[in-house]
């Protein structure tokens, strides 16, 4: 079994403040957003989520900057009579490299992204075949492992996670609000995994396992958990997600060990027991199995290379 799946090493936040007073989750801004904590809102469009923190000091926006989601967020902020957006915390996901900074930079905000995502955005900006969405630009700042952003009464901790959706996975803990955003977590179905961009199934499972383990005794510190897609979640639902990922990885890994091709792995339906719950979202069971297969093959190749290097010394 892959040692990453066996260990599911904890890579999360080690020091977090107590939970702020929790506001009842309620629809606000004329139905454009849901308030999940004091001064903290979630905007949803086509299943994807964007986080808005509207403080007296300004606004912080976090998530994948899909144009339709950004447009809805702007309408919500106007309805909330919020101040100017000061920070845009960009997260990776399908299409993120072309979404640039979401257009927040030209409105005066400082946009920042994990350095791998920022690099792909920069590459897209220089490639005629994959231009950035009109009105967007390369984020002004990048970070490698962690960055902390203080704005008024809110402090956001952006922490690099194991490669999951891509090599630019990150988690954001909003300490003032006491909520967590995970870009590799999905509640509406199987997660996206871009293996070519450095992603891998084991990394998605590691991230989920780390938060489940580290906050099992204090779930209120990170709940509600805001996934990239789907409804707000509890730590129990994150645990269910993690258990599914580990089981699928183990099943696909065995198929690879048995010499099955990717098409044969798909035909074996290793996700069959999970499809009723997880197979109805935008990522089909077949697509998920193909990504899982590629992830396992890549992990086994990396492990073989490490062992080869060890024998050479």
Each predicted region: which residue ranges?
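N-terminal export leaders
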Residues: 3-7
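Bacterial N-terminal signal peptides
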Residues: 9-18
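Sec/Tat signal peptide C-region and signal peptidase I cleavage site
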Residues: 19-23
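Metallo-beta-lactamase
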Residues: 24, 35, 58-60, 65-68, 117-247, ...
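Conserved beta-strand hairpin/beta-sheet module of binuclear metal-dependent hydrolase folds
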Residues: 31-77, 170-174, 178-184
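Active-site HxH/HxHxD metal-binding segment of metal-dependent hydrolases
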Residues: 78-148
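Accessory terminal helices/loops
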Residues: 216-222, 231-313
